[in-house]
């Protein structure tokens, strides 16, 4: 498939109330049709809380919920959630396909300014999922500030960033998303939440979908709940990469 229909759900989150959040997304997903990828924000069941894992749903329950909507919408669907594992709590990006195939990516870069590294385990493995002819890289919030993690090989066409990124640093969010698109010659989508959390942080969203030149393909109204839709062209992306093959001059390196 050369065209990918992408949807981002920029929404408020109820603090530490997974069932309320799932009911809210149920209402939204009920009306979504004919999309290929649907993305929810970071920690979409709880909000970005350091004790979210104490209130976490079992992973099987979250996967069953995502699978239900993946089948109903015939789309790859996902976002990140706080989960408990035998080794400890993780901030895990789950992407589920209609046939039940699951990709799990654990957030690599934990936000130490909130003490996330004291409550969650850092992911160790970068993941790419192939879906309908597209290669998709899942990333979570603070990962955005570390370009090496998304730069070491040209193995994806679309990077998905899910976040709880406060309004106080909105300029960084917008600038870094564009930088990741330009330097990696890939589509980049950032799905952020809106509203206020119980720690006093305000979120204005600024969810956006960018092409490989850093040009805006779709952008949500700041501070408003929104469904953001765009159609991405793999042929356009490949033509640009061939026309401007900067990756051939990239410095090669390995992640240790």
Curated annotation (Swiss-Prot):
InterPro entries: C-N_Hydrolase, C-N_Hydrolase_sf, Omega-amidase_YafV, UPF0012_CS. GO terms for molecular function: 2-oxoglutaramate amidase activity; omega-amidase activity. Residues 4-234 form the CN hydrolase domain. Disulfide bonds: none annotated. The active site is at residues 42, 107, 141. Its EC number is 3.5.1.3. CDD domains: Xc-1258_like (cd07575). It catalyses: a monoamide of a dicarboxylate + H2O = a dicarboxylate + NH4(+). It holds the Pfam family CN_hydrolase. The keyword DNA damage does not apply. It is an enzyme of class 3 (hydrolase). Keywords: Hydrolase. Belongs to the carbon-nitrogen hydrolase superfamily. NIT1/NIT2 family. Hydrolyzes alpha-ketoglutaramate (a-KGM) to alpha-ketoglutarate (alpha-KG) and ammonia (specific activity 21 umol/min/mg), has very weak activity on L-glutamine, and no activity on deaminated glutathione (dGSH) or glutathione. May function as a metabolite repair enzyme. This is Omega-amidase YafV. It comes from Yersinia enterocolitica.
């Amino acid at each position: 498939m050369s065209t990918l229909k992408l949807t981002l759900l920029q929404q408020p989150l109820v603090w530490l109330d997974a069932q309320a959040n799932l009911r809210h997304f149920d209402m939204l997903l009920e009306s979504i049709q004919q999309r290929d990828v649907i993305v929810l924000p970071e920690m979409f069941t709880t909000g970005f809380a350091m004790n979210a894992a104490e209130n976490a749903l079992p992973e099987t329950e979250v996967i069953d919920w995502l699978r239900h909507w993946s089948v109903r919408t015939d789309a790859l669907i996902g976002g990140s959630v706080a989960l408990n594992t035998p080794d400890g709590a993780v901030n895990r990006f789950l992407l589920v396909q209609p046939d039940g195939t699951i990709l799990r990516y654990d957030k690599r870069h934990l936000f130490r300014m909130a003490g996330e590294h004291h409550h969650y385990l850092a992911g160790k493995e970068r993941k790419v999922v192939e879906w309908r002819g597209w290669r998709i890289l899942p990333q979570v919030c603070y990962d955005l500030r570390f370009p090496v993690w998304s730069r070491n090989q040209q193995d994806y066409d679309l990077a998905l960033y899910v976040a709880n990124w406060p309004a106080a640093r909105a300029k960084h969010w917008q600038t870094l998303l564009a930088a990741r698109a330009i330097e990696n010659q890939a589509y980049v989508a950032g799905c952020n939440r809106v509203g206020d959390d119980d720690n006093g942080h305000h979120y204005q969203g600024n969810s956006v979908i960018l092409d490989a030149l850093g040009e805006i393909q779709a952008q949500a109204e700041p501070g408003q709940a929104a469904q953001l839709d765009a159609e991405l062209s793999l042929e356009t992306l490949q033509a640009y990469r061939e026309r401007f093959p900067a990756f051939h001059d990239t410095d090669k390196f390995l992640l240790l």
